[in-house]
Amino acid sequence: MPHILVKLWPGKTEQQKKKLASEITKAVMATLDDSEESVSVAMEEVKAADWTEKVYKPEILAKRDTLYKEPGY
């Protein structure tokens, strides 16, 4: 606990994804007072053409009450 899933468009390098995972892990540890061993981070690439149907509608619009940071689009 916790497990964080980041959905993003393809095209980011492995180095960028590893850095993002590291920074998310640090933020979770500092904010929630969890150990590094308790944090897991996954990345799921979603094509831009599929974003609306696979991410925006089911996970953003349909679950607005669970969002702590909404997108600006």
How would you label these PLM feature ranges?
Residues 2-73:
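A domain-level signal for the structural core that forms small-molecule/cofactor-binding pockets
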